[in-house]
UniProtKB/Swiss-Prot annotation:
InterPro entries in alphabetical order: ATP-grasp, ATP_grasp_subdomain_1, D-Ala_lig_Van_CS, D_ala_D_ala, Dala_Dala_lig_C, Dala_Dala_lig_N, PreATP-grasp_dom_sf, RPE2
GO MF, any single term: ATP binding
Superkingdom of origin: Bacteria
Gene Ontology CC entries for this record: cytoplasm
UniProt KW keywords: ATP-binding, Cell shape, Cell wall biogenesis/degradation, Cytoplasm, Ligase, Magnesium, Manganese, Metal-binding, Nucleotide-binding, Peptidoglycan synthesis
Family classification: Belongs to the D-alanine--D-alanine ligase family.
Pathway: Cell wall biogenesis; peptidoglycan biosynthesis
Known role: Cell wall formation.
Enzyme kind, highest EC tier: ligase
Catalytic activity: 2 D-alanine + ATP = D-alanyl-D-alanine + ADP + phosphate + H(+)
Positions that bind ATP: 181-232
Name the record gives this protein: D-alanine--D-alanine ligase
Length: 354
């Protein structure tokens, strides 16, 4: 086991992150698990003031205030190493209320948006960078906001004739005392990623919806549970790179623990599905990406129902993870794009909206 203490310094007088220690247990294919440890304050920056003449200055924005903070920080470590290997000057910024001041102070050429969740994935940072006229990676304001909100993205999918599971929206103020839908069903927060807050309610579960406390906002989507195969498509700069299947090994659904712990799921890439279905997924994913006007990397999630072989779209993620267990880097590697080159392709697509 190797322990890494991450202590990034954004500027000579500004300490950005000093209280996160991430345990990385390496096997041949990458990280075994991601675990938070007690705060420490003695780590040393790995990318402070690394400057390569003739190369652009990249502000790597990560961390932030969302429930996905730790995933963002782990992603940023790999991204930082790739950017340094490519010869860029890298300055890390932990997203906070003073983000505009920090960006104005360091004047980067490009912002690499490595955030997940609120303020980074929902279009807020994109909007600020549009105002500041700083090119940035990943999708713009409308694309990010639309993809991040499950109510609006579902409406958009259905408008564009993309098949989705039956669902309803439940508000906390509705004070529902009975089951909102016949079991089994899925409870999904409106604006969370990494499967945070998702619950699957099966027939045998001891669960009373009247006692549900809405931990992630005053609205949830209740969606019919579909038993089937998890299929994921990586899209980079408008081109679908491949399809990966997730085979669950321990938990009943693809939850946070399964996503970020080695041994909880097996990734099959390319997905062992018929060629016509494989090609259909690539085409459908490119359609979703392009009509949503996305930019840079994205991941589109589907379910293939066991009983009917019917395909259901789940969502598009405009800020997919870049951890060693993340899906987009794995599919990119299958397509012949190593992690460093993947980051370079993301940087090449950086722009701001006028």
């Amino acid at each position: 086991m190797h322990q890494y203490q991450i202590h990034w310094v954004e500027h000579s007088e500004v300490k950005i992150l000093s209280n996160i220690v991430v345990r990385l247990e390496y096997k041949e294919r990458g990280v075994k698990s991601i675990t938070n440890r007690r705060a420490r304050h003695d780590a040393v920056s790995e990318s402070k003031s690394i400057d390569y003449s003739g190369k652009k200055h990249i502000a790597l924005v990560a961390g932030g205030m969302s429930a996905e903070r730790e995933v963002s920080l782990v992603s940023s470590k790999g991204v930082s190493k790739a950017l340094i290997a490519l010869g860029y000057k890298v300055t890390f910024i932990d997203m906070g209320a003073d983000i505009a001041f920090k960006l104005q102070e360091i004047k980067p050429d490009i912002v690499f948006n490595c955030l997940h969740g609120t303020y980074g994935e929902d279009g807020c940072l994109s909007g600020l960078l549009n105002i500041m006229r700083i090119p940035y990676t990943h999708s713009g304001v409308l694309s990010s906001a639309l993809a991040f909100d499950k109510i609006y993205s579902r409406s958009w999918f259905l408008t564009n004739n993309i098949n989705m599971a039956e669902s309803i929206v439940v508000n906390k103020s509705d004070n529902i005392k009975i089951e909102p839908m016949k079991r089994p069903y899925v409870i999904k927060p409106i604006t969370q990623g990494s499967s945070i807050g998702i619950e699957v309610i099966f027939e045998e579960d001891d669960f009373n919806f009247a006692n549900y406390d809405f931990p992630y906002g005053d609205q949830v989507i209740i969606e019919k549970y579909i038993k089937g195969r998890e299929l994921q498509v990586a899209v980079l700069n408008g081109k679908a790179l491949g399809v990966l299947e997730i085979k669950l090994l321990k938990n009943r659904f693809y939850d946070y623990e399964t996503k970020y712990t080695e041994g909880f799921a097996e990734h099959l890439c390319p997905a062992p599905i018929p060629t016509n279905l494989y090609d259909k997924l690539l085409i459908e994913s490119e359609k979703i990406y392009k009509t949503m006007n996305c930019k840079g990397p994205a991941r589109v999630e589907f379910l293939l129902e066991d009983q009917t072989n019917k395909l259901y779209a789940l969502e598009i993620n405009t800020h997919p993870g870049m951890t060693p267990l993340s899906i987009v880097p794995e599919i990119a590697a299958y397509a012949g794009i190593n992690f460093t080159n993947l980051i370079e392709e993301i940087i090449k697509a950086a722009s701001f909206e006028s």
